[in-house]
């Protein structure tokens, strides 16, 4: 008697397990279907609809990491840097939260790490009250990108852009205080009333600007035709020249900066010509 009851109980357990497995399988199929629908909406720029579909995919299968990554990306696409609205802040924060959730399960996810770096950079570059803090976070996360992908030229490029952004406003303010126009081709002048102004700026910004130059060089070592890095070589060297001690040093640095401008222009023209030639030859153009 007990044997029959035991067999019946086992049969019930097996049946319940089968139902659970079928249900899990159905949920995964639902999740996949919502993912595809979300991808289609995303490709046509319907980011809000895409986010809805990705949310449904996660609801059907909470372990679906790809859907969560796509959801975060859909929210990030709806964020507009510099727009100070509650909705825009929500897009930024939701994207950030979802990318962070992705990293809890997959700490070395490159796309999530790059996206967090980008979110911090964009909000920092918007010049809000927390700009300096967010740019520092952007630097931290771009270094994490390099830790995952040492050949990531965009991360090195951004590490070069950040110190220039941080120096831009103080440099302009210093020129104004020293009665120098932005176009005046001289390093910052000593001033009896503001005797420590230049020294203070040099102590704070010289090394970060120099590090920025080195990071752009690393980006160019990865891609010698990276014209964006060339453009920031120009800006970093040109602005750092304001901290030079002599007119001779300044002139030499400005010449080097101008050389980078020319190289960037030549590279851009060469790429455009190569692309046009490829199209004319019937080939698929590449970047």
Language-model segments: residues:
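Bacterial signal peptide processing site
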Residues: 27-29
């Amino acid at each position: 008697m007990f044997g029959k009851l035991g067999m019946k109980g086992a049969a019930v357990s097996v049946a319940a397990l089968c139902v659970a497995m079928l249900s899990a399988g159905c949920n995964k199929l639902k999740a996949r279907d919502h993912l595809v629908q979300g991808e289609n909406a995303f490709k046509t720029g319907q980011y809000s609809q895409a986010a809805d579909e990705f949310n449904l995919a996660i609801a059907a299968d909470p372990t679906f990491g790809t859907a969560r990554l796509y959801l975060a990306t859909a929210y990030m696409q709806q964020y507009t840097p510099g727009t100070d609205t509650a909705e825009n802040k929500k897009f930024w924060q939701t994207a950030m939260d979802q990318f962070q959730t992705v990293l809890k399960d997959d700490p070395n996810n490159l796309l999530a790490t790059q996206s967090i770096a980008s979110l911090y950079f964009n909000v920092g570059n918007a010049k809000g009250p927390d700009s300096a803090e967010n740019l520092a976070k952007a630097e931290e996360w771009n270094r994490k990108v390099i830790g995952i992908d040492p050949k990531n030229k965009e991360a090195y490029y951004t590490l070069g852009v950040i110190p220039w952004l941080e120096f831009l406003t103080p440099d302009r303010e210093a020129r104004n205080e020293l009665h120098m126009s932005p176009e005046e081709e001289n390093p910052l002048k000593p001033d009896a009333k503001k005797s420590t102004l230049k020294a203070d700026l040099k102590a704070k910004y010289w090394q970060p600007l120099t590090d920025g130059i080195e990071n752009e060089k690393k980006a160019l070592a990865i891609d010698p035709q990276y014209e964006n890095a060339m453009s920031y070589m120009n800006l970093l060297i040109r602005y750092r020249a304001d901290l030079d001690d002599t007119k001779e040093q300044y002139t030499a640095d400005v010449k080097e900066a101008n050389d980078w401008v020319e190289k960037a222009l030549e590279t851009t023209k060469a790429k455009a010509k190569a692309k046009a030639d490829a199209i004319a030859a019937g080939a698929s153009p590449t970047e």
